[in-house]
Amino acid sequence: MPRQFPKLNISEVDEQVRLLAEKVFAKVLREEDSKDALSLFTVPEDCPIGQKEAKERELQKELAEQKSVETAKRKKSFKMIRSQSLSLQMPPQQDWKGPPAASPAMSPTTPVVTGATSLPTPAPYAMPEFQRVTISGDYCAGITLEDYEQAAKSLAKALMIREKYARLAYHRFPRITSQYLGHPRADTAPPEEGLPDFHPPPLPQEDPYCLDDAPPNLDYLVHMQGGILFVYDNKKMLEHQEPHSLPYPDLETYTVDMSHILALITDGPTKTYCHRRLNFLESKFSLHEMLNEMSEFKELKSNPHRDFYNVRKVDTHIHAAACMNQKHLLRFIKHTYQTEPDRTVAEKRGRKITLRQVFDGLHMDPYDLTVDSLDVHAGRQTFHRFDKFNSKYNPVGASELRDLYLKTENYLGGEYFARMVKEVARELEESKYQYSEPRLSIYGRSPEEWPNLAYWFIQHKVYSPNMRWIIQVPRIYDIFRSKKLLPNFGKMLENIFLPLFKATINPQDHRELHLFLKYVTGFDSVDDESKHSDHMFSDKSPNPDVWTSEQNPPYSYYLYYMYANIMVLNNLRRERGLSTFLFRPHCGEAGSITHLVSAFLTADNISHGLLLKKSPVLQYLYYLAQIPIAMSPLSNNSLFLEYSKNPLREFLHKGLHVSLSTDDPMQFHYTKEALMEEYAIAAQVWKLSTCDLCEIARNSVLQSGLSHQEKQKFLGQNYYKEGPEGNDIRKTNVAQIRMAFRYETLCNELSFLSDAMKSEEITALTN
């Protein structure tokens, strides 16, 4: 059956939900001050009057419930369901026999979903004994039954919306969450079905630059409508507007779904419920750590050959133009000046310029340069000044040196930049255990950017087994429009995505781009999130082909149209047996909380995510959906948030899927191994244990664009399975106790949602 995008109508949205969503957007647009704009979504930390009034309201609700016969019946039915859930989540304890022996009874329990015909078989994995924390009672949320059921059902609906968008774009969605939501294929589909398709690395005897394996051309036609590229089998189909059978997104449906999430994050009972659950998760981890820290440490000590230094780590968020540290850049500049000062490196007004003349024009001698005079490091002056931070990409404040050393398109064809990237790659290969995912820019000014970038990659032989590439699209349409480089926003989207569709449909005609795309694993959306936009994105927003103003579209507008085209492209590439792409935008570093709502629907994973701390509902949803978050505390420390206030440790303890990344080593780091610098500082400041560090490292590999074969090699054959069954301690150095705790805790939280849905069914049957 062909995959289709399920459409909804705006009239199907509850009027109250729609008005609330519009109120949220209007609030964000009206108030530039971030604290005021976030007031709708935050739970006040210190407001005695507000807390007292809230407690009074809760008490009145509790007293009213005690007198209600109907509520008593519902409580009784829910108590039965909850008792069953708790008994299933607590496997019996036995002596640990060690990793080689299988003991099914010791495995964390797989969920029993509504409508399941039989109990799922527990994972055949041995588990060491450890101390568990459980809470029993009528309902464990600490709020009234009515509020609990309302919150749980709303959260379940939000997760179902997320699952719909993830599956349509071949993004990842946790199988365990899908099981609890009652997805019909969750029990029958093979565990590896939901994995993204990344091209495996070439074998040692294979040429990574071979152009002869392109599949045959299909000669489909591609036409943009409303900012989205549609594929047609032939000219006749195009004339009749009958596109190829692929899922094409619908803006009205997206607006409906976004309205539900926006209304949810402002709902009082849901905010209270999520706030309590998040506090519980953090407290539960503290208790787990207190009770089982030594048991975890004993597990790691008995694990031969593996420690923190020789587990694989991936830098999941790093920009190629700043992937080297400042000393590396300085050394390279001096080396090129000493070895080839008379080489022609630029052309200005028809006059060729040598490297010596470039520095003479800047009135400087490279011999006298220091890391301080190079001035590429971010400091105190860049805090909350993204404009000053961007200027740090210009060595010595000279854009000429940036164009010469840090660009792929210049007189030398990006040779110097390629050489530096290859030096960084060589250091990664020597370290053996470190990988990175550098971002390369595509601006959308011209469709020639793609073939030029592919040529740069092949011409300078930039491939490295320790690197996977991500394409970042800066949100700077307003700059190009003001310079008359683009007629409308639709043209920018066409320049970004049309070459990819052509290379997918007719790879024989675009061999270089087809080859380059094998090593590209995702797309990123980048720029200063704190920029204010006066436009409220909705189904009434102008189409990209009529967005001709010099005003930049809002963040949500960018994300929807990038996701829409990536979704269609992924389905086309999957049909052809080619690799697919993940959407991994910068999100939640600054700006509006609505950015995180857009990413919840459209992104596979995000970078930064700091603003999740401001919204308990979104933070809890990101936890339940296990959305990967690449965090860069040293980068944030120089730009938006002091290191001590960074929520990474808090997110890790609660169980969010976080990894450590460097962002821009040139601006923020001092050592040659920037990623190890991140881990070392985090470990010292937050007193992270070895198990914590290895868990973060394992998360980074899971989040990354490394292929299925590589992840099996680095994490274990069953890495895609959830819980201890998917963990091979011999490769990850993550204690099975920790994996069991994470899995059982997630199952427990998800069971609250499924129990609420079951209680509704039982109540309906008894009435």
UniProtKB/Swiss-Prot annotation:
GO terms for cellular component: cytosol; extracellular region; ficolin-1-rich granule lumen; secretory granule lumen. Its cofactor is Zn(2+). It catalyses: AMP + H2O + H(+) = IMP + NH4(+). The gene is AMPD3. Transmembrane segments: none annotated. Zn(2+) binds at H317, H319, H586, D663. This is AMP deaminase 3. SUPFAM superfamilies: Metallo-dependent hydrolases. It comes from Homo sapiens (Human).
